[in-house]
């Protein structure tokens, strides 16, 4: 059952979206905006379709992630109109719409046809969505400037969106607890995934992204995508990066657990968690997100030195020489919302020293970001250092000892508030 406090925020959310989208339309000279939910394409020479989760702007208004062939019309000063595709079909069931407050401020209509609805006097019409479903639809299709404005309208979350994200964190954390218990009980990656799904009540196809569940050296593959059916003989580590989708909104949480007889790796996990919490505390209006990324590298350097993995170099020198990038190759995080890697995060390119950073903006109240430092033992990144002039600073024996633990990543979902930050993940633990 949805939380009534969340439901009570729905009408104000729709009204705010109406205001934001009306401004975008006015700025670009449009009278009507039609949004397509999209549809899953079929596999080549097959009658099975790919998994479908819906177009971001459609979810922004409705939260209906699995609703194909549906359309939403936005016009200034008028109720939004939602056409839901609900065919008479004995093969499949149509989704049942619960009576909720947002339906009072949206005109919802059922229709049998999958194509775009015919509009009366739309004026200058713009249509956005997957080009595969827009063929033959009148109007301007996906103009770049209007699409950018609509994506910018998603950057600062409404109170409704923030509470949906908070609830998505609560559900996901139940899964993370179950996954940790399954690991400590000796389960396999496959079994841990089942435990996560059971605890979250979410099917794999409903997840916002494929859950990353890596034991031992698999934790060193950043987006490890397979699940071994058998557990390793010696379970040394678990890295699980997994979220849920709630009413269209995603959580994205990562936790790392050391095995019971891994004191060195346990110390690294604890050290990285302390760093991660300090980085979360940096989140505040006016802070350049790139600065958080750079502080993360200095923190990783301190941890490498304290653990004995690297010695004989100052922290700044470790960063300048690229040593920290071999241990921490990805960005510190990204925007979060309807999409896991939410839109409009890079108005400027990633800096040269952070090529994989997905967010390069100055933080503002209402933004939601992830903070996810990592420390990994990835052979393809470490071998060039171990075989180069930097080898004199690296503890090869300790690296070899920890290599089969794979790596560590710790990730929280954080709201930028007027006064600082609200950590949605930690408040639910």
UniProtKB/Swiss-Prot annotation:
<dbReference type="Pfam" id="PF21216">
    <property type="entry name" value="PepQ_N"/>
</dbReference>
<dbReference type="GO" id="GO:0016795">
    <property type="term" value="F:phosphoric triester hydrolase activity"/>
</dbReference>
<dbReference type="GO" id="GO:0008235">
    <property type="term" value="F:metalloexopeptidase activity"/>
</dbReference>
<keyword id="KW-0482">Metalloprotease</keyword>
<dbReference type="InterPro" id="IPR036005">
    <property type="entry name" value="Creatinase/aminopeptidase-like"/>
</dbReference>
<keyword id="KW-0378">Hydrolase</keyword>
<dbReference type="InterPro" id="IPR029149">
    <property type="entry name" value="Creatin/AminoP/Spt16_N"/>
</dbReference>
<keyword id="KW-0645">Protease</keyword>
<dbReference type="GO" id="GO:0004177">
    <property type="term" value="F:aminopeptidase activity"/>
</dbReference>
<feature type="binding site">
    <location>
        <position position="252"/>
    </location>
    <ligand>
        <name>Mn(2+) 1</name>
    </ligand>
</feature>
<dbReference type="GO" id="GO:0046872">
    <property type="term" value="F:metal ion binding"/>
</dbReference>
<dbReference type="Pfam" id="PF00557">
    <property type="entry name" value="Peptidase_M24"/>
</dbReference>
<dbReference type="GO" id="GO:0006508">
    <property type="term" value="P:proteolysis"/>
</dbReference>
<keyword id="KW-0464">Manganese</keyword>
<feature type="binding site">
    <location>
        <position position="252"/>
    </location>
    <ligand>
        <name>Mn(2+) 2</name>
    </ligand>
</feature>
<feature type="binding site">
    <location>
        <position position="334"/>
    </location>
    <ligand>
        <name>Mn(2+) 1</name>
    </ligand>
</feature>
<feature type="binding site">
    <location>
        <position position="411"/>
    </location>
    <ligand>
        <name>Mn(2+) 2</name>
    </ligand>
</feature>
<comment type="similarity">
    <text>Belongs to the peptidase M24B family. Bacterial-type prolidase subfamily.</text>
</comment>
<keyword id="KW-0479">Metal-binding</keyword>
<feature type="binding site">
    <location>
        <position position="411"/>
    </location>
    <ligand>
        <name>Mn(2+) 1</name>
    </ligand>
</feature>
<dbReference type="InterPro" id="IPR052433">
    <property type="entry name" value="X-Pro_dipept-like"/>
</dbReference>
<keyword id="KW-0224">Dipeptidase</keyword>
<dbReference type="InterPro" id="IPR001131">
    <property type="entry name" value="Peptidase_M24B_aminopep-P_CS"/>
</dbReference>
<feature type="binding site">
    <location>
        <position position="241"/>
    </location>
    <ligand>
        <name>Mn(2+) 2</name>
    </ligand>
</feature>
<feature type="binding site">
    <location>
        <position position="372"/>
    </location>
    <ligand>
        <name>Mn(2+) 1</name>
    </ligand>
</feature>
<dbReference type="InterPro" id="IPR000994">
    <property type="entry name" value="Pept_M24"/>
</dbReference>
<dbReference type="InterPro" id="IPR048819">
    <property type="entry name" value="PepQ_N"/>
</dbReference>
<dbReference type="InterPro" id="IPR022846">
    <property type="entry name" value="X_Pro_dipept"/>
</dbReference>
<dbReference type="GO" id="GO:0102009">
    <property type="term" value="F:proline dipeptidase activity"/>
</dbReference>
<comment type="function">
    <text>Splits dipeptides with a prolyl residue in the C-terminal position.</text>
</comment>
<protein>
    <recommendedName>
        <fullName>Xaa-Pro dipeptidase</fullName>
        <ecNumber>3.4.13.9</ecNumber>
    </recommendedName>
</protein>
<dbReference type="GO" id="GO:0005829">
    <property type="term" value="C:cytosol"/>
</dbReference>
